[in-house]
Amino acid sequence: MYLLIEKKILVELLHGIGDIVCAVPMLRALRQKFPLARIDVVVKFQTCADVLQCADVRLDNCYVLNVYSGVGSIYKFAKKCRKTGYDIGIAAPHTSVIKTKIFMRLIHPVQWFGIQKQGICFDTMLNECHFVEAYFLAAKELLKEEVVVSAPVLIPPDLSQNDEQCLNSKTIDGIVGVCIGNADYSYKYRLLRMGRVYTRGWGIENMRELICKLMNSGISVVLFGGKQEELLLPELRDVLTSDKVINMVGKTSIAESMMLTKKCKCVVGVDTGMMHIAAAVGIPTVSIFGPTNPYTHGAYGDKAKFIYDVKYCEKSPCYGSKMYVKCTDRKCLKKISVNEVYNIISNVIN
């Protein structure tokens, strides 16, 4: 009965960019299962909607709901959903149980699916599976038969002629993309939204040293980052003047960043959404991990490499525990040397 054209499905994806990328294979399977259905998604930021525009799956509508803009916008969206009359709601696996129940009650689909019905969410699964696989668990009852879990695929538009010429002029021994940021922050005091902690950051000093080693090897570097990473640029002032460095921090949209990754031999960074994007575009990635588990949170695909070792900290990965935010030394990341990262990049691009 689910194949009828009037079936309306809403998928809740109110999370970050990396989580959105990980949802793409499930959305693809959902469209294959229900080719005539109306499939809508709701995301938290416009950048997430931009990512889905490049996904290899047809979606009918992508709504942006800024959950931080107040109760009014949430009420307005819920009212719109009730007017649409969704038959099916699907919850992202890492939305908490209580938030899922509130959200589904607000939008009021005929029925909804998600692992939250079992009283769990991704953060309580203790490293059982990858984000990508968790999305399939969320829709398991709906998809019914066994589905082969595949990697996310993003298809960005082509570079402009000017950008192409700029990158080609820099290519000596290839281009390596460097995501200079420390990833999103968490709060020490979550309810008060106070005490920002960059739990996954490797440090801009390490990034600067890595960039220098790459340049000294004849490798050109393109720097990736958003508005938040612009604050780190003063720490890189001595390398920004090099003709081997292309600084795109704060200068590109998500779609443009995707285009640029296509010209890279490799993209390196910490556990960020950009690493998921690069892998989904088909580019080899080298990701630096510490408090999160690369095999559950990392880029999904056979070209993804991870720098991670539990010997650096016996409590790693600590994501989901109090230590994730309250740790004071971050030795799981600090003990990863620039040379170690550089050597793995060299192996990948050669």
Model-derived segments and their meaning:
Residues 1-350:
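Catalytic machinery of carbohydrate-active enzymes
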